[in-house]
A protein has these predicted regions:
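Conserved Radical SAM active-site core
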Residues: 1-135, 143-174
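Auxiliary Fe-S-binding modules of radical SAM enzymes
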Residues: 131-132, 145-296
Length: 296
């Protein structure tokens, strides 16, 4: 615990909450929902602001605690109340105004849910969030994660390839607008969108210094860059080894490309990349970070 007292628990019941989609029987700490503004600037956690009092906001401003990472989801107050299942969630957006006026650096996040906050609602959210730039320095758009444990929860559907292409078109259009106005791309799509749409990853300069890396924005591009740089600094040799790399299904093709780059310098090393199917959480979960020991 990096705090002097207990963590503040979440007062929301978000329709997309991953903790609500976990199976029973795991360790107790995995079921704790935090929504603590102190963890935002200390550890980079995203907070909804519904748990922050006016006194908390003024303390952040007084001590200039930043950046504050805000989980927006929607800029439509009524829709935000619905998504967070909290009647105060819409009013909590007014706290963003106060942070903006005080010059507190912020990053934003939108967990996109099909048929809920995408399409016209996403367009409205991006339009409204753009007004906070460059104090709000970046916003990530990530697709909702859906496990097989959703009985009794809001009926959400996975995005299709066509959906992903439409989301990227919106984001790329806003990136161009924001770059021309502020010199930053501002809004960023997580890597999943590009993979799902079958489109190439953006070049490194489009990520504005990887401000949203922990949200899966630019992880694959950064990995590719780091592998190429590391290989370029080595002479290579003829050692014989067999290397097995386990990863999630989403990243597997990119990990294979990285292994091919390494193999050019180390031609006698045999690489095998194994894409792990997620049986624990369900096949819709394809990221490496949610692979469990039993699936390995």
């Amino acid at each position: 615990n990096g705090l002097m007292d207990d963590y503040r628990s979440c007062s929301n019941h978000c329709m997309f909450c991953f903790i609500d989609q976990m199976p029973p029987g795991m360790r107790e700490t995995l079921y704790f929902k935090d929504d603590d503004s102190r963890l935002s600037f200390l550890q980079g956690n995203y907070v909804t602001l519904t748990n922050m009092s006016q006194e908390d906001i003024e303390r952040v401003i007084k001590y200039h605690l930043s950046p504050i990472n805000v989980s927006f989801q929607a800029m439509n107050p009524k829709l935000r109340c619905k998504m967070l299942h909290n009647r105060f969630a819409g009013d909590a957006l007014k706290k963003v105004d106060r942070l903006y006026e005080a010059g507190i650096t912020m990053n934003g996040q939108i967990v996109l849910c099909k048929g809920v906050n995408d399409g016209e609602e996403l367009e409205y959210s991006l339009q409204e969030m753009a007004k906070y730039a460059p104090v709000l320095q970046s916003v990530s758009v990530v697709p909702v994660g859906l496990t097989k444990f959703r009985d009794g929860l809001y009926p959400l559907e996975p995005f299709t390839k066509e959906d992903a292409k439409a989301v990227l078109e919106q984001i790329h259009r806003w990136q161009k607008i924001m770059y021309e106005k502020h010199g930053i791309h501002f809004i960023h799509a997580s890597d999943e969108w590009y993979i799902l749409a079958g489109e190439k990853l953006p070049e490194e300069e489009r990520y504005d210094g990887y401000l949203q890396l922990e949200n899966g924005v630019g992880m694959l591009r950064l990995l590719d860059t780091e592998v190429r740089e590391a290989v370029a600094q080595r002479d290579g040799d003829d050692r014989k080894e067999r290397v097995t790399v386990a990863t999630g299904r989403l990243a597997a093709p990119y990990i294979k490309k990285c292994m091919e780059i390494i193999q050019k310098k180390y031609p006698k090393i045999t690489f095998e990349v194994i894409a792990i199917r997620n049986n624990f959480f369900g096949e819709k979960i394809t990221v490496s970070g949610l692979i469990t020991g039993q699936d390995l």
